[in-house]
Regions:
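DNA polymerase processivity clamps
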Residues: 1-99, 114-232
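Specificity-determining recognition surfaces
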Residues: 105-106
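Bateman (tandem CBS) regulatory domains
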Residues: 109-113
Length: 232
């Protein structure tokens, strides 16, 4: 159920776009997937094998209730038909109407090859992003991520008019294929949310340029997180 909560985290609260307030559950190639997005970030989880064709947009509020009631249980039975879905947890069942509509073609946002790939220790990265976030309040949480392949350093920078420039760096493995600087601006809260969802000691940051989607991967292949860059 951890994968459910980590996916539903990025669903939208904007009721004018009801499809984005839900989580898309679907099957493809014999696997069951769950994906959500608010238009600024996206999370995809690979859940389990599925022999049935599934395509349903579930209200994120329903999934939040499922996670709350699940407790220490590791399995939940799911049944859906037409416009309803039911979750069976021991002696409790939760039934909800599905959100009507077609989910966005999100896979086109996920880069298959990237010009820039940075691998860092996840815990160390979280530390310096938290520091940068404190200095980034004037810029609506925007921070600059920059990789230096020569020095093998990843720097996180934020700028304020009162406190000036704050930069922290950590060691990183950096692969650069492009000619442009290995740099991108991201929302610090969105980045911290993603880093806290990923599992494993290391995290990979992959992108194709400062205006391209940023793909973040942990050490487990069942979860992918994407953040759209901040234009600066």
């Amino acid at each position: 159920m951890k994968l459910i909560s980590r996916t539903a985290l990025v669903s939208s609260n904007d009721t004018t776009r009801p499809i984005l307030t839900g989580v898309y559950l679907y099957s493809q190639g014999g696997q069951l997937y769950m994906v959500a997005t608010d238009g600024y970030r996206l999370a995809e989880s690979q859940l389990t094998e599925s022999k049935q064709d599934v395509s349903a947009i579930i209200p994120s509020s329903t999934l939040a209730e499922v996670v709350r009631l699940l407790g220490d249980l590791t399995e939940v039975e799911v049944k859906y038909k037409d416009d309803q879905i039911t979750f069976l947890l021991d002696n409790v069942s939760i039934t909800s109407r599905l959100i009507d509509g077609k989910f966005i073609d999100y896979r086109q946002l996920i880069p298959t090859e990237t010009n820039y790939q940075i691998t860092v220790e996840r815990a160390e990265f979280i530390k310096i992003v938290k520091v940068a976030e404190l200095f980034a309040r004037e810029s609506a949480g925007s921070i600059i991520i920059e990789g230096n392949p020569t020095d093998r350093l990843l720097s996180v920078r934020s700028i304020t008019s009162q406190l000036g420039d704050n930069t922290s760096s950590i060691e990183a493995d950096i692969v650069v294929k492009g000619t442009e600087p290995c740099m991108v601006s991201l929302n610090s809260k969105f980045l911290l949310d993603a880093l806290n969802c990923l599992e494993g000691d290391k995290v990979r940051i992959m992108f194709n340029g400062k205006l391209a989607p940023v793909l973040l991967l942990g050490e487990k292949p069942d979860y992918r997180h994407i953040i759209m860059p901040v234009k600066s």
